[in-house]
Regions:
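Conserved phosphate- and dinucleotide-binding cores of soluble alpha/beta proteins
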Residues: 1-114
Length: 114
């Protein structure tokens, strides 16, 4: 556990203490669950403390997995977490439209739907 403030709805710890703890570790894989994803705005969230933790996890991870259901694509939220990056693995459900999937693929973003 990192310590910090507990965000019950997200079941996570956040805040300056949590961020400082994460400064001292490296992780193999991180799973990020954004509020929204769009080609124009990137990976986004709606709670600043939670977004800070997501940013830090991306920074300290060897592999980054972005998991979002299909309803979150081509939507925006309040705070940008990160740019879309072809090195990340994007996981969604099979409900994503063929058109949206093709647009992302043509921009170098591969979506795993299985």
């Amino acid at each position: 556990l990192t310590g910090g403030f507990y965000l019950k709805g997200e079941n996570t710890l956040y805040g300056e203490f949590a961020l400082k703890t994460l400064d001292n570790i490296r992780v193999e894989k991180s799973f990020i669950f954004p509020s929204s994803i769009s080609l124009g705005c990137g990976i986004m969230g709606s709670l600043s403390g939670f977004v800070d933790i997501q940013r830090k996890m991306i920074e300290i991870s060897d592999e980054v997995y972005i998991a979002a259901d299909s309803s979150k694509f081509e939507k925006t939220s309040l705070i940008k977490t990160a740019d879309l990056n072809p090195r990340y693995t994007y996981i969604t459900d099979s409900g994503i439209s063929a058109e949206i999937k093709q647009i992302y693929e043509s921009n170098g973003i591969h979506l795993i739907t299985e």
